[in-house]
Design a protein with these regions (language model features):
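Bacterial N-terminal signal peptides
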Residues: 9-16
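N-terminal lobe/hinge region of extracytoplasmic solute-binding protein
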Residues: 28-78, 108, 186-190
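Mature extracytoplasmic/periplasmic domains
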Residues: 162, 318-338, 492, 503-507
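Surface-exposed binding/hinge segments that line
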Residues: 75, 119-170
Length: 528
């Protein structure tokens, strides 16, 4: 038996020794909780789990509506000055008082070079200023009517704790030498982390000093990484775990037919897409030397037309995905109905490649996670086969998400030529997509922090600036529409594939709240 299997078994065995009266919630995910530093990796699973421990100035309720969090209320004093009134009597888990100093520190920390959440506070150049111990002003260089839309996952950290533990700088997502904040947590939220063994298990207990009123009935939460799909499903069906995510699509009917568990399915707001290196003068992982084929719009369009997303949604995703024409879910942008995804056309794709100077195609390495999104590696395998039909030889490099993100994101200097990624706009608004995916960036992640391939167009930069400050909804939607037309229908900057469906497996004993943002917030879970 492999060491990791033994460790997982030991974790389950230890958990089973708890008293019968204790409501212990055990859950498994396909990937690891790589870091406890909430600024190191802008990833849904990480932010969701840490959202049980850390809190933002705002929160989102079960219906994703913005509600007060660590800020009791806020007001716009003028278009470029917002004031937030902080809750009094809130403490971090180590007993320190939560004050305005922590908010100012957290704002400054979010802009540090290694931070993966630089776009949480926009526009760039926004300053947090302490008014008194429980009041903070945010001074903006230009208006932003949705300033606080992403602050439910901009988690506030203790200034004193970070300074005392050499954690003023965020833990880089690719860091091998883990910082104190990457291995320990000190939040204000409903749970505290009492044990963290990366790759094995993380243990949570209720925070007895939390300022809010608990809705859960859990005495202990144990998270375990189970990367193997079959093992994860077996653990759910046997009762070794109370919750498993994701349930492979081919196992949904089997789980629903069992006596002990069921699958909670619903639409997710995440868009799965493909991206290209459009930045380097020479494509790093290719047999083409001295130039970069992806700088040619004809090549990008050829790749788009060479991929049959309808077949992927039908066969690979077993009809549990909605093909997308845009980099945002139509649930979040009303004018998405005006866009139609082009049908696959291998003949036209070959013609475009020939016109671009690649009549025989070329080779390129594709980076892909194998434990992050639903059927991620299978999607990449399908893309590889489809592109082979137009003369493109794809060398697939599929890796666990820890290695994958460390390679392709800012901490790895965007080390990819062609990649698969997923994106959920934290604000549930198109500006987040434009600012993160279409804004020009540099090698330090300034600008479009998650624009891995560095799509860059000065016209798009102007659209992004205009969208940020436009208050008229109709005018703003038209600006967003024009931006998407530029990015997709003219520049072919990305290949949006689909919005995947959620597939959470849960014990019949569990009452679960499932939101479309796919965050596992067990402070709402109850075990009967």
């Amino acid at each position: 038996m492999k060491l990791k299997t033994l460790l997982i078994a030991a974790a389950f065995a230890a958990a089973s020794l708890t008293t019968a009266s204790a409501a212990t919630f055990r859950f498994a995910f396909q990937g690891d909780l790589k870091s406890l530093d909430p600024y190191s990796l802008n990833e849904t699973f990480t932010h969701g789990v840490l959202g049980n421990v850390y809190e933002g100035l705002t929160k989102r309720d079960k219906g994703l509506k913005i509600i007060p969090g660590l800020a009791e209320r806020w007001e716009v004093l003028e278009p470029t000055r917002w004031r937030f009134y902080l809750r009094k009597g809130v403490k971090f888990q180590n007993g320190e008082d939560f004050t305005a100093d922590d908010v100012v520190f957290s704002a400054e920390r979010s802009f540090k070079p290694a931070s993966d959440i630089k776009t949480r506070i926009q526009p760039a150049g926004t300053k947090a200023v302490k008014v008194d111990d429980h009041t903070v002003d945010f001074i903006l260089p230009s208006p932003n009517p949705i300033l606080h839309y992403e602050w439910d996952t901009w988690y506030i950290m203790s200034k004193k704790w970070a300074e005392s533990n050499n954690s003023v700088e965020p833990q880089p997502g690719a860091g091998q030498q883990m910082s104190y904040a990457a291995l320990h947590a000190n939040g204000t939220g409903p749970f505290i982390i009492t044990e963290h063994q990366a790759g094995v298990k993380t243990v949570f207990k209720p925070n007895p000093n939390w300022w809010g009123k608990p809705e859960h009935n859990l005495d202990e939460v144990i998270f375990t990484t189970i990367s193997n799909d079959a093992t994860r499903v077996a653990a759910l069906l046997s009762g070794d775990v109370d919750f498993a995510d994701p349930i492979p699509l081919q196992d949904v009917d089997r789980v629903n037919a069992s006596a002990n568990a069921r699958v909670l399915q619903g639409p997710e707001l995440r868009t799965i897409f493909l991206g290209f290196d459009q930045y380097r003068d020479e494509l790093k992982y290719s047999n083409i030397k001295g130039k970069n084929p992806f700088k040619d719009v004809r090549v990008r369009k050829a790749f788009y037309l060479g991929i049959d997303e309808n077949a992927i949604a039908d066969k690979v995703m077993r009809k549990a995905a909605v093909p997308s024409a845009l980099m945002i879910s139509p649930l979040l942008f009303p004018l998405a109905k005006d866009f139609t995804r082009p049908k696959a056309d291998p003949a036209e794709a070959k013609k475009l490649l020939a016109e671009a100077g690649y009549p025989n195609g070329f080779e390129v390495t594709m980076d892909c996670p194998n434990d992050r999104y639903v059927n991620d590696e299978a999607i990449c395998q399908a893309v590889t086969a489809m592109l082979a039909r137009i003369g493109i030889k794809v060398n697939l490099l599929a890796q666990p998400k820890a290695k994958y993100f460390a390679k392709i994101l800012v901490s790895g200097h965007y080390d990819s030529s062609f990649y698969l990624l997923g994106w959920t706009p934290g604000s549930f608004d198109s500006w987040n997509v434009l600012a993160n995916m279409y804004a020009c960036r540099d090698e330090n992640g300034k600008g479009g922090n998650n624009n891995v391939g560095n799509y860059c167009n000065p016209k798009m930069e102007e659209f992004i600036k205009q969208v940020l400050v436009e208050n008229d909804t109709a005018k703003r939607d038209q600006l967003i529409k024009a931006a998407y037309q530029l990015g997709q229908e003219q520049d072919w900057g990305y290949i949006p594939l689909h919005q995947q469906a959620l597939a959470w497996g849960a014990s019949q004993k569990m009452k679960i709240v499932q939101r479309a943002d796919n965050q596992i917030l067990f402070y709402w879970f109850r075990k009967e």
